Amino acid sequence: MREFMQYVRNAFYGATGWSEDNSYKDLNVTARELIDFPLPRGIRLSLSSLATPHFATSYQLCNVGVVDGSISYLHSSVPLAAVPAQSNKIPLGALMRSYRGLHQLGSRGGTPWSWETGPQIGTIPQVPAVADMGQIPNKDKSSLLYGRLYLPQSLLEAMVIKRFSPALQVQISAVSEQSLRNGGTMLSVVQYDRGKYGVEGLYSTDGGLLGLRGLYNFGGDASVAVMSSQNGTGSPESTEKERIYGRFSAGGEMYYGTLNKSGGMSLGARFATLPTHKGTPLTATLTINPLMGNINTTYAVLAKDFLAMATRMEFNAYSYESDWAVGLELWSNRRPAGFLLGAEPSLDLESDQPELPSKKERSFQAKMEWRLDDPEPEPEPVKIAEKPTEGKEEYLGVFKARLSSNLDLGLVWEGRAKSLIFSLGTGVDLQRLGEPFRSLGLEVQYSS
């Protein structure tokens, strides 16, 4: 479950038209969120508020052996008045959904974020963004300031995001703590996104790290034929025949530590279906670290609107070690008790639909006389109950599970109870059945 501040930060990206699809670090983000979702530990309570359209606060209290907490503040130069901030109105998909599909390249500077489901997810219907992008002043010069103080450790973290142009953005993150070298560390990232490709340069004071990474898109909506049709040139019929409803992406990264004189690199590729794809949304990635010999493959699929699954396979060419992991999330429109009894989420919505009249077979007498039956009076039209949309959410919660080759099992149930958003989870070690439970936690969020 995403924290409130991360939800507001994603809303800031959506209001300014910035998409993270072209970032190499998010190449396999879909499978990572489906498999490596965090397990709550202990008890954590969060109280947050979007006090003004430009300012948000969050207070957190934790009890994991010792009592600690944090205080967070966020300021956005872009007004976020249209963002649902009350915990009883925040769409659960924006906080809990893991599968993340790609946006159309033509949506650069448009409305890539949906308050209904969060990131676009392929076949799941999207609602129009509530913020009118044309009414936001200086959205290409927007900025975001974020700070968080952890108590009683007195650890301070801060982040600044500054937009200089529609394609150029700078992000600076810093952490201040006495136990760190020189009392803290800072990471600076320069992002340049042109839609068809994206380039990032980074520098970290921890080890004097210098890095460069990039991602290039081709095929699908990134092809020349499709881009020309979006610009009004080219034949729509020929474009439709040549179009591939998926996008290929290839990229890599290189980094070098100026203090420890060491470096590294990796290469990666991804194929993901586009929102216009009418079939099953899927994402497949392959990353290779030639220096360390690591090969990583992932495959994620949105089998149903309420079911997403992912697998990951890692292999090392030098040591012949391998590791695998699987994960899934299952959305339900039933309460936890009804969900455990077993029922597909769509059954409740379909059970209220009346049966439609079937076509009557020709009578035996008519068949013998080689004629049709006499016409019967037309039956009264059947009224089909419409699916309720106002006052009732499509889903009430989500069940997440993962299993790795080490037989580590993670289970999480996330949902909403009245005005509280909760996450209840546990970690189980199947290799130690005598003491299987490794962690157990409950996280509760409330925002206004």
UniProtKB/Swiss-Prot annotation:
Subcellular localization(s) per the UniProt record: Mitochondrion outer membrane
Keyword vocabulary terms for this entry: Membrane, Mitochondrion, Mitochondrion outer membrane, Transmembrane, Transmembrane beta strand
Keyword Ion transport: no
Bilayer topology term: Multi-pass membrane protein
Keyword Mitochondrion assigned: yes
Pfam families in the record: MDM10 (PF12519)
GO cellular component: ERMES complex; SAM complex
GO biological process: establishment of mitochondrion localization; mitochondrial genome maintenance; mitochondrial outer membrane translocase complex assembly; mitochondrion-endoplasmic reticulum membrane tethering; phospholipid transport; protein insertion into mitochondrial outer membrane
Main localization category: mitochondrion
Function of the molecule: Component of the ERMES/MDM complex, which serves as a molecular tether to connect the endoplasmic reticulum and mitochondria. Components of this complex are involved in the control of mitochondrial shape and protein biogenesis and may function in phospholipid exchange. MDM10 is involved in the late assembly steps of the general translocase of the mitochondrial outer membrane (TOM complex). Functions in the TOM40-specific route of the assembly of outer membrane beta-barrel proteins, including the association of TOM40 with the receptor TOM22 and small TOM proteins.
Quaternary structure and interacting proteins, as annotated: Component of the ER-mitochondria encounter structure (ERMES) or MDM complex, composed of MMM1, MDM10, MDM12 and MDM34. Associates with the mitochondrial outer membrane sorting assembly machinery SAM(core) complex.
Family, per entry: Belongs to the MDM10 family.
PANTHER family on file: MITOCHONDRIAL DISTRIBUTION AND MORPHOLOGY PROTEIN 10
Domain-level remarks: Lacks alpha-helical transmembrane segments, suggesting that it resides in the membrane via beta-sheet conformations similar to those predicted for other outer membrane proteins and porin.
HAMAP family attached to this UniProt entry: Mdm10
Record protein name field: Mitochondrial distribution and morphology protein 10
Protein's gene: MDM10
